[in-house]
Amino acid sequence: MKVLPIAIACMSISWAASPAFSQDARTDLQQLFAEERAFLWRMDPLTATGDGVHDYDDRLPSVTPAAQEQRVAADQGFLQRLRAIDRGALTAQDQVSYDLFDFMVSQRLALAQHREWRAPLNSDSGFHADVLLMHEVANPRSTADYERYIARLEDLPRYFDENIANMRQGMRDGFTLPAEILEGISRIVAAEQFKKPEDCPLYRPFAHFPTTVPEADHARLATAGRSAIERSVIPAYSRFQEFFEREYRPQARHTIGASELPGGRAYYADLVRYFTTLPDATPEQVHQTGLAEVARIRSEMEAIVRELGFKGSFAEFLTFLRTDPQFYARTPQQLLREAAWITKEIDGQMPAFFGRLPRTPFTVKPVPDQLAPNYTGGRYNPGALGGAGEYWVNTYALDKRPLYVLPSLTLHEAVPGHHLQGALARELENVPRFRLNFYPHAFGEGWGLYSERLGEEMGVYHTPYQHFGRLTYEMWRACRLVVDTGMHWKGWTRQQALDYLAANTALSTHEIRTEVDRYIAWPGQALAYKIGELKIVELRRRAEKALGTRFDIRAFHDAVLENGGVTLPVLERKVEAFIAR
């Protein structure tokens, strides 16, 4: 069987801009980009708010089938207009934008045919959980801001009803989440049943008004906000729970693989291409790549076990790591302090590895309580455009959050991982707006995993256990290639996936369960990490070999990050251009 090739064949289209640069082509391209964003913001007010566009802050998106069809028709028009523009007449930077826009819109169309909107949630998030964060993105600063925010709260029942109607359509079509993972979602939905407005995160802007809002308006706005949550938000969550428990769970499918859905094999094949950003990637190739990486990393892990002089089998060593109290924080504050300390230690090394650093800061916060039980160990939240980023650390079930993986988690989610990457992208100048938040998963998650590896060179790992933790995180991502394709393409059961992760990683039993349920609910996404990291490592080795003593690690990293989020084929061409300078 063929292992997925890490080298990507260079496209026949020249990377450099054509000497026959056309201002008309550039004008047409910029107009197309502007019209696409304007349409997207109008159709998705939450994205508009996050992008700093406040024209639609008083409403939530429409997600009806008619709205979905409107999006498809618009994307077909956008793609047709793009293909009519002579790419060869563009500058090198505009060619990057052209290629990324092509990927973004064509992939939206490829996935739209599978009508994913019929299942608008996964194991740890979804429409019901996402809206509970909208107060942070909205961040109202004036009386008018608050009034628009209140109107958006009052629109929530309509938004929930449309999503419920879409889920009912999925039930009729056999396009549902698997019944086997719904218990965890049920716990999240139960935690979203608020007894009074003050218990709801969406009330927080009314608890503390900024000084920019006149004090004379505070009481009126607080009363209106409380009323909106009491009359609109709380009943909407109650109706959703009733629907989820009484209708959805009893009728959810009893298979777990995406390939078991109607049209599922074509659907999963499209997801593999989308999440890897590789047009020729196949599930079988990805699976074989995963098996090869698991074997390689296992040998490195076993070498550390021997170095420690542990008397026992590999499985017994994993049990020791999962159960010995020395490896776990005693309080949430201890875990958060450890994470914050690691971020500052990394900060001291950043100038030696990166020439360009972002202006935007980030903070360390616990995962919100209502999400934590079914959430991953940590995640990065970029926040609203212009605001600080957030490194979320999960403080739920501390005996399942080993400290020996905390350096890897921090490198991945904060710096030099997602915060560095995302903040630099948002600070790009003279690029179309869509690129500021563009996130091709293989590049984004591949960079996060590469950052964990870079931590070795930065001196972040101080003990053999932390080195083992780094390897277990890498092994975890290699296992994802095997497990995700196993369940969604090769017919694996959930138990097979659980057993495979338990046998090969030092993740806690709780983390293994939440991870497998995430892969089941979000098919294909787990492939992005290792495929992207392998490409970045391969490109670095290529640059080191080609440049020899002229290789500069800071310049290489800047070249990788200077265009924000890119597909792996675009990244390869950019690194080839870096080598040729």
Where are these regions (language model features)?
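Bacterial N-terminal signal peptides
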Residues: 5-16
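N-terminal maturation segment of proteins
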Residues: 21-581
